[in-house]
Amino acid sequence: MFHRHRRPSFKARVNVPMVTETRDRLALEVRMAGESLIGHPSIDAYNVLSKMLAALERAGMSTVLLHPGTRVMNTICDRYEENGSISVAPEEALRLRQVTAAIDASLHRIPLQRFALAVAEVETFAVVVDPTTSKE
């Protein structure tokens, strides 16, 4: 009787580290999202940085690093709801720069597949709750 050779099953839970090139590109994207919100405040710039912070938290980045940025983003959002415009105060700009620098220094700790999954989950959530997208 023949026995089929079984291949070892793929273990998706293995933590694949982020390669330097990927980490550097992501660090640049995070810093540029922060600078974009600071330099040219807009709803789009706010949403880009907000989704990045959400994905990083979902991927397991320390909330101690992310919490100051989340507080600033909440303050910006509250101000937008009060007066209808996105603006970033100088002390908020400083705090956002500090947070993006801390994120930059910590990105190497996040496994690549965990980050990729977190980005997909945040993007899916954003599409589901976005009132501007309509199905025709």
Label for each model-derived stretch:
Residues H5-G60:
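Short terminal alpha-helical segments
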Residues V14, M61-S62, E81-I86:
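A ubiquitous short alpha-helical element
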Residues A33-N47, E82-A101:
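Short, low-complexity cationic-aromatic patches
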Residues P8, A12-V16, I86, A120-T124:
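Intrinsically disordered, low-complexity segments used for protein-protein interactions
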Residues N47-I76, A105-A120:
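Extended intrinsically disordered, low-complexity coil regions enriched in Ser, Thr, Gly, Ala
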Residues S87-E136:
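Amphipathic alpha-helical binding modules
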Residues G34, C77, E81, D104, ...:
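Generic secondary-structure transition motif, activating predominantly at the C-termini of alpha-helices
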Residues M1:
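BZIP DNA-binding basic region
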